[in-house]
């Protein structure tokens, strides 16, 4: 696995040795960032942005954001093996000053933990078998941490049919292999 673009383009990052984490594939990550880059008027600009990466795993998405100019990424992860790899990746690229790791279940997120008023981009990548995505959308809406320019990106299994909460205004859906990427906003 490697960083796709930005200041750390081409740098390899570590992945877990066990099968319990499903790292976001390079191709899918690259496609997500191409969509963000080519829709700057519609979506947030990553430069100096604050990113919330829920179910961070190895941190590949958040690291990509920092590489492309984000000033801060808040990583939420509660699986110990993933946390170890995430910390190793941040140390490897010397990104600790740009990051905050919260070692908790993403469903227990609170305003006090993230300690910022507005988030520019929120990436939700729960386990594919997890069916509580709407609960997270509800929590995020209740916390009032998004603005009109904030972007929500959700990574799901395209084979799983879900009714996404009406609180998320979906602007785009793309399929890549087994992955479905949903782009939207919460007002």
Place the predicted regions along the sequence by residue.
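Class I S-adenosyl-L-methionine-dependent methyltransferase catalytic core
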Residues: 1-187
């Amino acid at each position: 696995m490697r960083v796709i673009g930005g200041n750390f383009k081409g740098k390899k990052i570590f992945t877990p040795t066990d099968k319990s984490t499903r790292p976001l594939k390079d191709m899918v990550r690259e496609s997500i960032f191409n969509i963000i880059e080519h829709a700057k008027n519609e979506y947030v600009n990553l430069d100096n942005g604050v990113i919330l990466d829920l179910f961070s795993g190895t941190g590949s998405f958040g690291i990509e954001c920092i590489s492309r100019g984000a000033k801060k990424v808040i990583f939420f992860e509660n699986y110990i093996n993933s946390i170890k790899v995430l910390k190793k990746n941040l140390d490897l690229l010397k990104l600790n000053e740009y990051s905050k790791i919260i070692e908790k279940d993403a469903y227990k997120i609170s305003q006090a933990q993230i300690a910022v008023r507005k988030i520019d981009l929120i990436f939700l990548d729960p386990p594919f078998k997890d069916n509580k995505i709407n609960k997270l959308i509800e929590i995020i809406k209740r916390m009032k941490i998004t603005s009109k320019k904030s972007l929500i990106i959700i990574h799901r299994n395209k084979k799983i049919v879900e009714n996404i909460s009406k609180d998320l205004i979906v602007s785009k859906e793309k399929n890549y292999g087994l992955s479905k990427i949903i782009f939207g906003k919460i007002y």
